[in-house]
């Protein structure tokens, strides 16, 4: 018996009273207009959004890295981006990152985002990596000097399209 098993055995032997686990039913926050809340959350975290009635053209995208986001979260302004390319480093090396997300893919909260990811059984078969990205990279020193782009993009713009 190794140390771990010995410790667990001793714990089990000394547990005298067991309790049923309570049911935890956490409901995430809901918004009347998740898209509007998502836009506000992006502004709060120093990001930007552009809402289009039609997808942006190449000249509107500019000369920055552009990627499609699968899920946008109204609660905190983050976007789920799965790995579709072999190289994912552009998500973090770009000076400016544009993310395109559909209005129908804006959810209220992280609970709904993870439920949507989990509901897609093909998701993790097709993708090796996924990340939530939220606003530009920021850091501050002890004096409170805020620096953008310290670990990733200096600016993030989310294009909300139909």
Q: What is each PLM-predicted segment?
A:
Residues 1-162:
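The feature marks the mature, well-folded catalytic cores of soluble enzymes
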